[in-house]
Amino acid sequence: MVLGNDSTGDEFESTLKKHARELVDCLERGHFQQAVQLIQELSQARDRGLYQEVGKLTRELHNAIVDFQIDPHSPHAQEMSQIADATDRLSYVVEMTEKAANRTMDLVEQSAPLVNQLGDDSRELHQEWQRFMRREIDADGFRELAKRIEQFLVRSGENAGQLSSQLNDILLAQDYQDLTGQVIKRVTKLVTEVESNLVKLVWMAGQVDRYAGIEHDHVSMRHQAALERSAKGEGPQVAAEKREDVVSGQDDVDDLLSSLGF
């Protein structure tokens, strides 16, 4: 992802290099008033860069909220949110997977007795047939055996038809994979877009720190975050409609940013 050119940073660095040489020259020549003026210009240039980067970061954050259609003041915020939509889609995948798994297990449970019966009847008939081959049964026994064989063949045909139908149903129960696969791909795409936007915001926040001259102690920050993990936030503004320093919606944020040139 291309984060965009750092035109503001290049401009500030160019100004810094130019004024640094002039500042050294003024100090060497004893032109202290001019040197102070150059220092003030550098400070103003840094403040302008900081202001622009903070404005761009604020605009990007605001656009990210708008893009995902998350308005905490909207009564339909949950339905409008793409994140909520992704959650619903994943819930749909879970529901479809569970439904297919239950359907498959039910069909297997229905098929198991048919297979077991087929195996038991085959073993019994095989034993009787071995007795017949050893001439251990008489004519009446053979007629009874022939009748059992006929019944077995009829029952086997019926069971085979049921098994074939149930196997087809098991196969059809797996068609959820096509639908859920498409859903998962869409959610994955959304997660990738969110990650890309977050990386961009982190990069822009780094630019703000750069202009402000802020250096973070990451070890201390992680330790502090661990200590405050269970802390609660400030929560919503009380009587925000009566306060002039609190914006009340997305339109107010847009107007504010536009008035500042962002």
From Swiss-Prot:
GO BP terms: archaeal or bacterial-type flagellum-dependent cell motility; chemotaxis; regulation of chemotaxis
GO CC annotation: bacterial-type flagellum; cytoplasm
Region annotation Disordered: where it falls in the sequence: 229-252
Pfam family, one: CheZ
TM stretches of this protein: none
GO terms assigned for molecular function: phosphoprotein phosphatase activity
E.C. designation(s): 3.1.3.-
Main location class: cytoplasm
Site description Enhances dephosphorylation of CheY-P, residues in chain: 182
Gene3D superfamilies xref list: Helix hairpin bin (1.10.287.500)
Keywords from the named record: Chemotaxis, Cytoplasm, Flagellar rotation, Hydrolase, Protein phosphatase
Location in or out of the cell: Cytoplasm
Family: Belongs to the CheZ family.
Purpose of the protein: Plays an important role in bacterial chemotaxis signal transduction pathway by accelerating the dephosphorylation of phosphorylated CheY (CheY-P).
Assembly and interaction partners: Homodimer.
Stated name of the protein: Protein phosphatase CheZ
Organism: Pseudomonas aeruginosa (strain UCBPP-PA14)
Gene that produces this protein: cheZ
